Amino acid sequence: MLDKNKQIWFIGIKGTGMASLALVLHDLGYNVAGSDIEKYTFTQVPLEKAGIEVKNFDPANIKSNAEQVIVKGNAFKQDNPEVAACLDKNVEWQSYPDTVEEIVQMHTSIGVSGTHGKTSTTSLLAHVLGEVAPTSYLIGDGRGKGVEGSRFFVYEADEYRRHFLAYHPDYQIMTNIDFDHPDYFKDQDDYTSAFQTAADQTKKALFVWGDDKRLQSLKTDIPKYTYGFKDTDDFQAVNIEKTTTGSKFNVLAHGKDLGRFEIHLFGDHSILNTTAVIAVAYTEKVPMDDIKEGLLTFKGAKRRFAEKDFGDVSVIDDYAHHPTEMRATIQAARQKFPDKELVVVFQPHTFSRTKKYQKDFEEILRDVDKAYVTPIYASAREASGDISSEDLVNNIPGSEVIDLDNIADLTKHKNAVVVFMGAGDIPKYEDAYEKLL
């Protein structure tokens, strides 16, 4: 249990989720510190900025439960020196999800789950609600903020290994249910069952995308509101106007016009995410004029269609690594840059996912002006596999395999938008390319 009279010690504090959580607790007035590997990571920057002590792993860091509340990262097992020290000293620990659940219960809480769009929607919801009321948030890209006395707590609910089943929020947005994480979930039914349990644990209302049949099939004892573009949706986006600066649209709540909203975001998925945010805010009786203002100042989530310009070349950095996300990112790029050559540099993420979605990846990349595929990013759990980037390229006319040693090939593209897509270490390819511009 969290306790302001004890030190909150994080084993693995540099993990993206753990770093975010440490920042939230620090902001909420807890005494936070932690440890991790010595290697420098981007997540330690905000920790250091906040004055949170980050040490190397050392058994001496572990005291007693009378002095410390230990939060252990999911990746660390008995071979970690601090985990071993906990076992030797009979010191109990709690998990990341257990700790988040404690914060969930302190607030009017809104979880955002789904295969795609979690980070973007969580970021948008946290920003918009934060403009009208004190709001704490926890986002999967390494960002977290606590506000003492906050009304709302907005958090990204990750389905991997069923972590989100530790949570019992007031509200939950579910963006979609596409099968993912084949290394853990047996099949689509197994995956969907996790979302059914998450829905069962939501207290006040569920907000789901109306076009997703699996979301539609979820059984709930609480109100389940749909959002989308159809007349049958409870919250419907209508009169949509897309331009190269973003999108404008009205939202109807059960047929009632809530007004016209403008976002500096691109693609249908951004309109859907925004409609979900508006639906939650409306249900919590947040004034719509405040929501409109908040939407106008939102700049986007980290690594979600993040843009830089170099003369006539625009570079987009995006986390997309699943077919649905890739299609959304490409649609957004075409909306914002209709007159530029669309070049995609895609890093397949894990061998199992690449094998499962090979045909989808090939179909998507055949539709861009030029496709490059990097070597497959291997995960710690899956170091090799029986598929390669060459297998994809062989089925995509005009495409090429690209690596750091031939990254200069990208410089031949002029008046182009170059989209780097992937969830691994693809920023290293982008950095190498940008140094040549």
Curated annotation (Swiss-Prot):
<dbReference type="GO" id="GO:0008763">
    <property type="term" value="F:UDP-N-acetylmuramate-L-alanine ligase activity"/>
</dbReference>
<keyword id="KW-0133">Cell shape</keyword>
<dbReference type="GO" id="GO:0051301">
    <property type="term" value="P:cell division"/>
</dbReference>
<dbReference type="GO" id="GO:0005524">
    <property type="term" value="F:ATP binding"/>
</dbReference>
<dbReference type="InterPro" id="IPR000713">
    <property type="entry name" value="Mur_ligase_N"/>
</dbReference>
<keyword id="KW-0547">Nucleotide-binding</keyword>
<dbReference type="GO" id="GO:0009252">
    <property type="term" value="P:peptidoglycan biosynthetic process"/>
</dbReference>
<comment type="function">
    <text>Cell wall formation.</text>
</comment>
<keyword id="KW-0961">Cell wall biogenesis/degradation</keyword>
<keyword id="KW-0131">Cell cycle</keyword>
<dbReference type="Pfam" id="PF08245">
    <property type="entry name" value="Mur_ligase_M"/>
</dbReference>
<keyword id="KW-0436">Ligase</keyword>
<dbReference type="InterPro" id="IPR013221">
    <property type="entry name" value="Mur_ligase_cen"/>
</dbReference>
<feature type="binding site">
    <location>
        <begin position="114"/>
        <end position="120"/>
    </location>
    <ligand>
        <name>ATP</name>
    </ligand>
</feature>
<dbReference type="GO" id="GO:0008360">
    <property type="term" value="P:regulation of cell shape"/>
</dbReference>
<dbReference type="InterPro" id="IPR004101">
    <property type="entry name" value="Mur_ligase_C"/>
</dbReference>
<protein>
    <recommendedName>
        <fullName>UDP-N-acetylmuramate--L-alanine ligase</fullName>
        <ecNumber>6.3.2.8</ecNumber>
    </recommendedName>
</protein>
<dbReference type="InterPro" id="IPR050061">
    <property type="entry name" value="MurCDEF_pg_biosynth"/>
</dbReference>
<dbReference type="Pfam" id="PF02875">
    <property type="entry name" value="Mur_ligase_C"/>
</dbReference>
<dbReference type="InterPro" id="IPR036615">
    <property type="entry name" value="Mur_ligase_C_dom_sf"/>
</dbReference>
<dbReference type="Pfam" id="PF01225">
    <property type="entry name" value="Mur_ligase"/>
</dbReference>
<dbReference type="InterPro" id="IPR005758">
    <property type="entry name" value="UDP-N-AcMur_Ala_ligase_MurC"/>
</dbReference>
<dbReference type="InterPro" id="IPR036565">
    <property type="entry name" value="Mur-like_cat_sf"/>
</dbReference>
<comment type="similarity">
    <text>Belongs to the MurCDEF family.</text>
</comment>
<keyword id="KW-0963">Cytoplasm</keyword>
<keyword id="KW-0132">Cell division</keyword>
<dbReference type="GO" id="GO:0005737">
    <property type="term" value="C:cytoplasm"/>
</dbReference>
<keyword id="KW-0573">Peptidoglycan synthesis</keyword>
<dbReference type="GO" id="GO:0071555">
    <property type="term" value="P:cell wall organization"/>
</dbReference>
<keyword id="KW-0067">ATP-binding</keyword>
<comment type="pathway">
    <text>Cell wall biogenesis; peptidoglycan biosynthesis.</text>
</comment>
